[in-house]
């Protein structure tokens, strides 16, 4: 990727200006600089990827295997009042670790930061926003759902699931989990520092990795856009189901109120008093079915919220984390690599300028030493760039492992619609016979309902 990067560039007229620019150029961040030499053996963290047989670049996972790694529940704990603010606390229980711990939102924030520090080249899902004041129940519930999606994506992610910080977050029940997480992050470097494959990542990459990366990024962007629209439509359908439930319930209550009315009839209507009494009794009885219809509609809306909308949100969170990773790759390691190359070229120009001006040997030696140091920095950047592409390739595979989840979501939606309409239809059919008493014939006998005549039809 950087062929000829260390070759000296042609001498430019502005060598003196270049020399000044070298001195002003910032060194690459510490996270990318201190690495052991390539030839020096490095003991990996116990939880890091080991070298599997075959090509370690390829993942051999199924969706079922991913989902079986863990199932983490996040539930709200009853509010605890602080001196000024109410604190929201979550009960986090892991099936895998058989643990149950209590976490605050800020604990999730530190955990998220630790993941980004340790796994900068992996998909780290975003956290929901923090809202200090005026957090209503709806916001708190939405944030709980988002935190549950976040921790489940992390707990099932191959490298994350084997790392000690995940176990620490899910099982440590001590008083200060945040300090424990920070201490863990300070003791160890990032994944590049601890992975035994990091120095050889380039050997496993396909020759057209850049083309593959561009194509995958475009494909996943399109998938994200489509599923974002599907999620929005699904949310609207759930909202309509809940509104329909509320309307049916009110409809039934109004029928019940009408049937319970005790206002006496005027004398001129006394001839029809028996008819009105029968109608009231029938209307009052219909409210039971409408309450049942409302309950069925609410159940369908709730089921689709959990089985369709929430799973679509999980899938979108995953895709968004992939998009964020692509941006980190381009704006992070690639940008730092280009800066290191630029700084190196300026040093080489400065070297040529110093030779022309016949500077003292000591200053030349210092400059040569700085150039050697910069060459080491560039070598590290190249290794990190290749390792970043290596991780990106694996994360792309992981997204494709999750793709069958979309068929599960669609199946859940269809089944919910079938079941919901089936149950609603049964209640409507049970209600129909009760309507017969509402239609009284000329001699007081019940008459079957008939469609309205054209002259009475609504226009």
Curated annotation (Swiss-Prot):
Q: What does this protein do?
A: May be involved in several stages of intracellular trafficking. May play a role in intracellular protein transport from early endosomes to the trans-Golgi network.
Q: Gene Ontology terms, cellular component aspect?
A: cytosol; early endosome membrane
Q: Topology in the membrane?
A: Peripheral membrane protein
Looking at the record, which segments are called Disordered?
1-53
Q: What is this protein called?
A: Sorting nexin-8
User: Species name for this entry?
Assistant: Bos taurus (Bovine)
Localization of this protein: Early endosome membrane
Q: By its UniProt entry, which InterPro entries does this protein fall under? A: AH/BAR_dom_sf (IPR027267), PX_dom (IPR001683), PX_dom_sf (IPR036871), SNX8/Mvp1 (IPR028662), SNX8/Mvp1_PX (IPR035704), Snx8_BAR_dom (IPR045734)
SMART domains referenced in this protein's UniProt entry, alphabetically: PX
Question: Can you tell which superkingdom this protein's organism belongs to?
Answer: Eukaryota
Which residues hold a 1,2-diacyl-sn-glycero-3-phospho-(1D-myo-inositol-3-phosphate)? 104, 130, 143
Give UniProt keywords alphabetically: Endosome, Lipid-binding, Membrane, Protein transport, Transport
> What is the similarity comment for this entry?
Belongs to the sorting nexin family.
Taking every annotated instance into account, which residue ranges of this chain make up the domain PX?
A: 68-176
GO MF entry, a single one: phosphatidylinositol binding
> Pfam families attached here?
PX, Snx8_BAR_dom
Alphabetically, which GO biological process terms does the record hold?
early endosome to Golgi transport; intracellular protein transport
């Amino acid at each position: 990727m950087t062929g000829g990067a260390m070759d000296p560039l042609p001498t430019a007229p502005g060598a003196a200006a270049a020399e000044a620019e070298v001195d002003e150029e910032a060194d690459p961040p510490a996270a990318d600089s201190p690495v052991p030499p390539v030839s020096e053996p490095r003991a990996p963290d116990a939880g890091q990827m080991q070298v599997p047989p075959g090509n370690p670049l390829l993942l051999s996972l199924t969706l079922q295997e991913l989902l079986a790694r863990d199932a983490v529940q996040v539930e709200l704990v009853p509010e605890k009042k602080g001196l000024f603010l109410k604190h929201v606390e979550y009960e986090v229980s892991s099936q895998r670790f058989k643990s149950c711990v209590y976490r605050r939102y800020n604990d999730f924030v530190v955990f998220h930061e630790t993941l980004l520090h340790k796994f900068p080249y992996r998909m780290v899902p975003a956290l929901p926003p923090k809202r200090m004041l005026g957090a209503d129940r709806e916001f708190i519930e939405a944030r709980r759902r988002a935190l549950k999606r976040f921790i489940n994506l992390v707990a099932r992610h191959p490298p994350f699931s084997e790392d000690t910080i995940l176990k620490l977050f899910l099982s440590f029940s001590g008083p200060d989990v945040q300090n424990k997480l920070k201490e863990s992050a300070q003791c160890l470097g990032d994944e590049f520092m601890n992975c035994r494959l990091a120095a050889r990542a380039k050997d496993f990459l396909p020759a057209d990795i850049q083309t593959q990366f561009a194509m995958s990024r475009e494909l996943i962007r399109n998938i994200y856009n489509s599923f974002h629209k599907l999620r929005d439509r699904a949310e609207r359908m759930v909202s309509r189901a809940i509104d329909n439930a509320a309307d049916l319930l009110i409809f039934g209550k109004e029928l019940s109120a009408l049937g319970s009315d005790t206002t006496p009839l005027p004398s001129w209507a006394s001839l029809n008093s028996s008819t009105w009494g029968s109608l009231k009794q029938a209307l009052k009885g219909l409210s039971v079915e409408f309450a049942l219809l409302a309950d069925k509609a609410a159940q369908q809306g709730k089921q689709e919220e959990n089985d369709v909308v929430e799973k679509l949100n999980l899938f979108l969170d995953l895709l968004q984390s992939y998009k964020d990773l692509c941006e980190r790759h381009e704006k992070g390691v690639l940008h730092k690599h280009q800066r290191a190359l630029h700084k190196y070229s300026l040093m080489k120009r400065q070297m040529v300028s110093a030779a022309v001006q016949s500077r003292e040997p000591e200053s030349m030696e210092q400059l040569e030493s700085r150039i050697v140091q910069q060459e080491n920095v560039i070598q590290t950047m190249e290794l990190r760039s290749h390792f970043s592409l290596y991780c990106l390739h694996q994360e792309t595979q992981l997204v494709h492992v999750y793709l069958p989840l979309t068929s599960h979501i669609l199946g859940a939606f269809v089944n919910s619609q079938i079941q919901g309409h089936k149950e609603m239809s049964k209640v409507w059919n049970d209600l129909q016979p009760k309507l017969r008493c509402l239609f009284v014939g000329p001699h007081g006998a019940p008459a079957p309902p008939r469609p309205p005549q054209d002259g009475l039809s609504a226009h």
